[in-house]
Amino acid sequence: MNNLINIKEVEAKLNFTFTQPKLLVTALTHPSYRNETVTITEDSERLEFLGDAVLCLIVTEHLFLLFPSMDEGTLSTARAALINAVSCCQYTDALGLGEHLLIGKGERIQNERGRTSAYANLFEAVLGAVYLDGGLAPARQITVPLLPSKKDILPLMLGNPKNRLQQLTQKQLRTLPVYQCTPWTSQQGVPGYHIRVIVNDEVWGEGCALSKKEAEKLAAQKALDAHDYENKNTMDL
């Protein structure tokens, strides 16, 4: 057992107690750490593979039950948004698992893209470990509370908010939104971006995220929400 991992602390964050703690240790072991540590023989990659499938099943079931009249294509669009790397990274942040990741010295997370990838893989690996140890029920209990509310899922079914905002402003105002970017730092001290979306010299929405693309999407969605654009499109969903 690796003494660098506080098993009890991680279990408390997951609200799940492992009968096989070694599974959790493996899930928290980045391949780079195994490569640099002769006493470590397993890493998280196989558990990531399993966890990816478990996450897909849980999210699919959740959407299927939440939207009983929704067609398959629209459900697939929402599912893709809820299981992508950015979302999985957010789940890791919400659970506070990142600080427990064992990663090699040569694999330091130096930018947002590397962090997103490592944290997304971490969530999938931990979910795979929970599934192997306790089955689908505890994996579901961990995952579902992390998912957005029904109201927040609805916009995901309509596609990229930047595209929708552009269509709105072109159709109704015959103009295009302008995105202004300034530096931003998260509560964890990670540098990111603050985006303001301007329409006709007026701030319609703002968003902050670790990636510029995600911050722009958040700002665009805030703009759509503020101008009540989504309501007429999602009332019957």
UniProtKB/Swiss-Prot annotation:
Mg(2+) binds at E48, N121, E124. InterPro entries: dsRBD_dom, RNase_III, RNase_III_dom, RNase_III_sf. It comes from Chlamydia caviae (strain ATCC VR-813 / DSM 19441 / 03DC25 / GPIC). This is Ribonuclease 3. Its main location: cytoplasm. HAMAP family: RNase_III. SUPFAM superfamilies: dsRNA-binding domain-like, RNase III domain-like. Signal peptide: none annotated. Belongs to the ribonuclease III family. Residues 160-229 form the DRBM domain. The active site is at D52, E124. Keywords: Cytoplasm, Endonuclease, Hydrolase, Magnesium, Metal-binding, mRNA processing, Nuclease, RNA-binding, rRNA processing, rRNA-binding, tRNA processing. It catalyses: Endonucleolytic cleavage to 5'-phosphomonoester. Its EC number is 3.1.26.3. Gene3D superfamilies: 3.30.160.20, Ribonuclease III domain. Disulfide bonds: none annotated. It is found in: Cytoplasm. Homodimer. Digests double-stranded RNA. Involved in the processing of primary rRNA transcript to yield the immediate precursors to the large and small rRNAs (23S and 16S). Processes some mRNAs, and tRNAs when they are encoded in the rRNA operon. Processes pre-crRNA and tracrRNA of type II CRISPR loci if present in the organism. One of its GO terms (molecular function) is double-stranded RNA binding. The keyword Cytoplasm applies. GO terms for biological process: mRNA processing; regulation of gene expression; rRNA processing; tRNA processing. Residues 7-135 form the RNase III domain. CDD domains: DSRM_RNAse_III_family, RIBOc. It comes from the Bacteria. The gene is rnc. PROSITE patterns: DS_RBD, RNASE_3_1, RNASE_3_2.
